[in-house]
Amino acid sequence: MPSVNITKNNKTTLYISGLDQQVNEAVLHAAFIPFGEIIAVQMATDTEIDSNNIHRGFGFVEYELAEDCQAAMDNMHLSELYGKVIKVQLAKTINVTTTSNRAVWTDESWLQKYGNVEDVEEKQEDEKENNQETTSEKKEVSSYIPSSEKRGKKSRVYLDIQIGNTLAGRIEIELRGDVVPKTAENFRALCTGEAGFGYKKSSFHRIIPQFMCQGGDFTKGNGTGGKSIYGGKFEDENFVLKHTGPGTLSMANAGSNTNGSQFFICTEKTTWLDGKHVVFGQVVSGMNVVREMERCGSASGKPSKRVVIVDCGEL
């Protein structure tokens, strides 16, 4: 999509940092459009490098409405895009007129205060947190032994969904153990509960219409918890399967090789997630239930009703 000048209204403009070089304005637009009408998207190009394909790792998204901007910030801050955790905050304004054609990142004083320096500090803090998290995870070892009979084969599981106080119905999913055996086995065993823990009675904590329904955090219920049958987080198995359309089942993560138990069911085609999230299944029955779940979602991701997996297992 073409660049459009960002205004100085910091109530509707987001500053997004930590962007991978694969991210362009079209990708940024696609990632943030679920939250509301976007007026403009700009990437900060590196003026020291003679190439239109190189950016400085951050960009701006301007929304028409302040509430949409706030919803995007609340939902996308510390989320993952192209394998990197991004940071989203309200853009800091500089003293220029709204009719100025000068991009905000061309002001070096702005960059020193709000741009790259901040990113370095945040990166150092992130590395510190990640090191602490990795050390903690190494202590968590599972005694569960995954079924060797199920690995390498397709299987089917079900999720019985309750929305509010009403039983909405059953979702049946085919797991692609023939393509991603480790990932599929993790989900299957969490559905049956044979490892001593699993998805039963857990909720879908994040639902965004025209995007996806995310669940699987059975330890904290807010998107910060969950664990795999392997004792902690496990690696990205492969990216053979793609996010081709509604009903795609994929692993939620916080960056490369951080798979646990959280997953999401796509309600639309989400190709920008290809190569970054491991697809391991497909809804084969009950897509109407997924659509009913989707209607409980919001731009911020917070469901209007509690959506719970009241029962689950293998077919």
Curated annotation (Swiss-Prot):
List where this protein forms a coiled coil. Answer: 114-142
Q: Which Gene3D superfamilies match?
A: 3.30.70.330, Cyclophilin-like
One MF annotation (Gene Ontology) recorded for this entry: cyclosporin A binding
Asked if the record carries the keyword Disulfide bond, the reply is no
What EC number(s) does the entry state? 5.2.1.8
Q: Which family does it belong to?
A: Belongs to the cyclophilin-type PPIase family. PPIase E subfamily.
The protein here is known as: Peptidyl-prolyl cis-trans isomerase E
Instruction: Enumerate the UniProt keywords alphabetically.
Output: Coiled coil, Isomerase, RNA-binding, Rotamase
Which species is listed as the source? Rhizopus delemar (strain RA 99-880 / ATCC MYA-4621 / FGSC 9543 / NRRL 43880) (Mucormycosis agent)
Segments carrying the region annotation (Disordered) are 119-148
Q: Where is the PPIase cyclophilin-type domain?
A: 158-314
In Pfam terms, one family for this protein is RRM_1
Q: Which InterPro entries match?
A: Cyclophilin-like_dom_sf, Cyclophilin-type_PPIase_CS, Cyclophilin-type_PPIase_dom, Nucleotide-bd_a/b_plait_sf, PPIE, PPIE_RRM, RBD_domain_sf, RRM_dom
Q: What does this protein do?
A: PPIases accelerate the folding of proteins. It catalyzes the cis-trans isomerization of proline imidic peptide bonds in oligopeptides. Combines RNA-binding and PPIase activities.
Q: Where is the composition biased (Basic and acidic residues)?
A: 125-141
Q: Which reaction does it catalyse?
A: [protein]-peptidylproline (omega=180) = [protein]-peptidylproline (omega=0)
Cite the PANTHER family for this sequence: PEPTIDYL-PROLYL CIS-TRANS ISOMERASE, PEPTIDYL-PROLYL CIS-TRANS ISOMERASE D-RELATED
Where the record annotates domain RRM, the positions are 12-93
GO cellular component, as recorded:
mitochondrion
What biological-process GO terms show up in the record? protein folding
